């Protein structure tokens, strides 16, 4: 088999969606001396199959996050999940956790031509919710979330819980002009 990157290296690869993750993995493999790389699409399908079999076991819940989403819904606020993760994996994870009804809608990888940090996914969610950018808030945990919000013209509130391609989110946010960063 292929060499396995250390966990810290994998953490630095995460943050741009699964396709970007695989691109970064391929670059790492090349740097590790791997001469023949596997087919991209078959690698993607294998990774998705492995993740599907794990049932989200490695995804950690941020304490209070789902209760917060529930409170927003009970207050009549439309809550959409916008993720660069694959739709099938996301829907399965939400169903298995019994939280699929928490969200009014989902915009996932493949739903738009350009994933975050492009604004397309957020614009699709806002439009689908029948809202305006001025009424929306993006709560995210990565630079891609923040940049997508900025590009879509909406407020970004960031939490320090996610992977941010190897750079602490608070540090990155300060240099990029994002001031609303909260501990997870």
Residues of each region from the PLM?
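Short, acidic loop-to-helix structural element flanking the phosphoryl-transfer center
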Residues: 53-81, 87, 91, 119
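A short, structured active-site edge motif that brings together acidic residues
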Residues: 7-13, 38-41, 99-114
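Short loop-to-alpha-helix "cap/lid" segments that border enzyme active sites
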Residues: 116-128
């Amino acid at each position: 088999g292929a060499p396995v990157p250390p966990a810290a290296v994998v953490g630095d690869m995460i943050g741009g969606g699964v396709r970007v993750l695989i691109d970064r993995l391929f670059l790492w493999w090349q740097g590790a001396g791997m001469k023949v790389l596997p087919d991209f699409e078959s690698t993607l399908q294998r990774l998705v199959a492995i993740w599907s079999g794990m049932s989200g076991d490695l995804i950690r819940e941020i304490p209070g996050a789902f209760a917060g989403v529930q409170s927003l819904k009970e207050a009549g606020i439309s809550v959409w999940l916008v993720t660069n993760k694959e739709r099938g994996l996301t829907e399965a994870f939400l169903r298995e956790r019994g939280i699929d009804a928490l969200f009014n809608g989902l915009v996932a990888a493949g739903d738009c031509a350009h994933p975050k940090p492009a604004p397309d996914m957020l614009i699709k969610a806002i439009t689908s919710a029948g809202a305006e950018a001025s009424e929306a808030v993006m709560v995210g945990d990565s630079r891609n979330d923040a940049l997508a919000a900025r590009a879509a013209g909406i407020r970004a509130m960031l939490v320090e819980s996610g992977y941010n391609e190897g750079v602490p989110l608070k540090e990155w946010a300060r240099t990029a002009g994002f001031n609303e960063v909260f501990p997870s």
